[in-house]
Swiss-Prot record:
The tight homohexamer forms a small pore which is positively charged. Belongs to the bacterial microcompartments protein family. CsoS1 subfamily. Expression of 10 genes for alpha-carboxysome (Cb) proteins (cbbL-cbbS-csoS2-csoS3-csoS4A-csoS4B-csoS1C-csoS1A-csoS1B-csoS1D) in E.coli generates compartments that resemble Cb, contain RuBisCO and have its catalytic activity, showing it is possible to make artificial, functional Cb using these 10 genes. Cargo proteins can be targeted to these organelles. Artificial Cb assembly in E.coli requires csoS2-csoS4A-csoS4B-csoS1C-csoS1A-csoS1B-csoS1D (but not the gene for carbonic anhydrase, csoS3). Residues 8-93 form the BMC domain. It comes from Halothiobacillus neapolitanus (strain ATCC 23641 / c2). Keywords: Bacterial microcompartment, Carbon dioxide fixation, Carboxysome. It is found in: Carboxysome. One of shell proteins of the carboxysome, a polyhedral inclusion where RuBisCO (ribulose bisphosphate carboxylase, ccbL-ccbS) is sequestered. Assembles into hexamers which make sheets that form the facets of the polyhedral carboxysome. The shell probably limits the diffusion of CO(2) into and out of the carboxysome. There are estimated to be 540 CsoS1B proteins per carboxysome. Unlike beta-carboxysomes, alpha-carboxysomes (Cb) can form without cargo protein. CsoS2 is essential for Cb formation and is also capable of targeting foreign proteins to the Cb. The Cb shell assembles with the aid of CsoS2; CsoS1A, CsoS1B and CsoS1C form the majority of the shell while CsoS4A and CsoS4B form vertices. CsoS1D forms pseudohexamers that probably control metabolite flux into and out of the shell. Pfam families: BMC. One of its GO terms (cellular component) is carboxysome. This is Carboxysome shell protein CsoS1B. InterPro entries: Bact_microcomp_CS (IPR020808), BMC_dom (IPR000249), BMC_shell (IPR050575), CcmK-like_sf (IPR037233), CcmK/CsoS1_BMC (IPR044872). Homohexamer with a small central pore. Interacts with the N-terminus (residues 1-136) of RuBisCO (CbbL). Gene3D superfamilies: 3.30.70.1710.
């Protein structure tokens, strides 16, 4: 039988980099979450991902979505997965061992 992990995943997809950075900033300020990655989907779409406890991820994604909407018409989607299945973990970015903000910034902008 497959297993699940207790750490939640929050995702915000935006139109453009500026709303993505605004959302990432708001998410990390709003709750105790880790910025674990971003993905340039194509066509100007960017997805930003955070991990943490379910309640914190929920608060962070709400704050990030609100911040993204204030920038303009940047919000495409916001979603939370409470307990990510172990089979899904292999396609997600690795979580940094410590909450090094330099790592987060470097991986957001690279």
């Amino acid at each position: 039988m497959a297993t699940t992990h207790g750490i939640a995943l929050g995702m915000i997809e935006t139109r453009g980099l500026v709303p993505a950075i605004e959302a990432a900033d708001a998410m990390t300020k709003a709750a105790e979450v880790r910025l674990v990655g971003r993905s340039f989907v194509g066509g100007g779409y960017v997805t930003v991902m955070v991990r943490g406890e379910t309640g914190a991820v929920n608060a962070a994604v709400r704050a990030g979505a609100d911040a993204c909407e204030r920038v303009g018409d940047g919000l495409v989607a916001a979603h939370i997965i409470a307990r990510v299945h172990s089979e899904v973990e292999i396609i997600l970015p690795e979580t940094p061992e410590d909450s090094d903000s330099a790592w987060c910034i470097a991986n957001l902008n690279s």
